[in-house]
């Protein structure tokens, strides 16, 4: 089934570019930029990829991002991800990037954006992969910081298809960012938001009602709220689910417990994504294969999941 899944056209709608930083590239960029790493070698870094929760992962994720310094670094990161898309039958991707992760350590916004944009343009031309970039705000930082990031981004308004909300979920409900999302919406930028991963179903309601999002990133805890499930079935708001991520971060103890196929059969608009593939052990194809192995996903279910992803893109 792997060859069939590889050939199946699909979109990826929940991928953090910084989370596609493979250990080999991380070490190469550290050497290029003279960055001293806390790990002696690639094997030691891989051994550090053990997390009990989202915050433990994020601590490592932000540490790894420190090697990204130049436009070429961001190009190389994005291009490596796009090559993986081409290998796995991903024909359209809408990646997130976290400018605050970089600007807060002195990397200019334009440096980050230029490298990513150049790679996405080359991906369209050379690999035939369509794409749209999502500007994500870090929810563990104050809304004022997100507003400053939006100010910095607006001169490049045409570079983005949407704004998003990510980072530590617990204790940082979507309502804290209502003003900055309203401002982005006034500028013509639609919204997506991470909700219902570690946070409760109430966070999904807030993202829908107060941030007016077009998609929910993760959303697996919607299953705990029958009224929310009925609403999501009725509205067909897409949920960008990331199975390997959910298991690695202990949202589910084992892939056999994951609810994504139950959600699909209930009529929810779910699709499969990799989230932070370098850190969670797989890209989109590996996520599909995990569902096949542990949940017995059928070809018909895989076809529906892929069709959902393509129907849920924000850019044509």
Curated annotation (Swiss-Prot):
The record, for InterPro entries, names: A_deaminase_dom, ADE, Ado/ade_deaminase, Metal_Hydrolase
Q: Name one GO cellular component term.
A: cytosol
Catalytic activity as recorded in UniProt: adenine + H2O + H(+) = hypoxanthine + NH4(+)
What the record notes about the co-factor is: Binds 1 zinc ion per subunit.
Entry keyword Phosphoprotein = no
Required cofactor(s)? Zn(2+)
Please give the CDD domains that the UniProt record associates with this protein: ADA
Looking at the Swiss-Prot or TrEMBL record, what is one Pfam family this protein matches? A_deaminase
Could you tell me the keywords of this UniProt record?
Answer: Hydrolase, Metal-binding, Nucleotide metabolism, Zinc
- Name the Gene Ontology molecular function terms of this record: adenine deaminase activity; zinc ion binding
Summarize where substrate binds, as residue positions: 276
Question: To which protein family does this belong?
Answer: Belongs to the metallo-dependent hydrolases superfamily. Adenosine and AMP deaminases family. Adenine deaminase type 2 subfamily.
Task of the protein: Catalyzes the hydrolytic deamination of adenine to hypoxanthine. Plays an important role in the purine salvage pathway and in nitrogen catabolism.
* NCBIfam families from the UniProt entry: aden_deam, PRK09358.1-6
By what name is this protein known? Answer: Adenine deaminase
- Name its species: Bordetella avium (strain 197N)
Q: What is the lineage of its organism?
A: Bacteria, Pseudomonadati, Pseudomonadota, Betaproteobacteria, Burkholderiales
């Amino acid at each position: 089934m792997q060859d069939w899944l590889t050939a199946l056209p699909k979109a990826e709608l929940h991928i953090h570019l910084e989370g596609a930083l493979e250990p080999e590239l991380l070490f190469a960029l550290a050497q290029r930029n003279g960055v001293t790493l806390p790990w002696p070698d690639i094997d030691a870094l891989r051994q550090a990829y053990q997390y009990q929760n989202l915050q433990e992962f994020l601590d490592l994720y932000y540490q790894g991002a420190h090697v990204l310094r130049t436009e070429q670094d961001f190009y190389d990161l994005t291009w490596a991800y796009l090559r993986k898309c081409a290998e796995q039958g991903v024909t359209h991707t809408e990646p997130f990037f976290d400018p605050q992760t970089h600007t807060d350590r002195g990397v200019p916004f334009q440096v980050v954006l230029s490298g990513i944009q150049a790679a996405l343009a080359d991906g369209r031309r050379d690999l035939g992969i369509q794409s749209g970039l999502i500007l994500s705000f870090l929810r563990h930082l104050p809304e004022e910081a997100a507003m400053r990031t939006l100010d910095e981004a607006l001169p490049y308004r045409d570079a983005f298809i949407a704004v998003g909300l990510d980072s530590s979920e617990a204790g940082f409900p979507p309502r804290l960012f209502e003003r900055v999302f309203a401002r982005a919406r006034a500028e013509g930028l639609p919204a997506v938001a991470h909700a219902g991963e570690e946070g409760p179903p109430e966070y999904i309601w807030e993202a829908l009602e107060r941030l007016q999002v077009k998609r929910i990133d993760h959303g697996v805890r919607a299953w705990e709220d029958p009224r929310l499930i009925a609403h999501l079935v009725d509205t067909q708001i897409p949920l960008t689910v990331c199975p390997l991520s959910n298991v690695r971060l202990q949202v589910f103890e084992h892939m056999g417990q994951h609810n994504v196929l139950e959600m699909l059969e209930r009529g929810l608009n779910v699709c499969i994504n990799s989230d932070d593939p370098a850190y969670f052990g797989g890209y989109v194809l590996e996520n599909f294969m995990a569902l096949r192995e542990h949940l017995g996903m059928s070809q018909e279910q895989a076809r529906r999941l892929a069709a959902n992803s393509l129907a849920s893109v924000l850019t044509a």
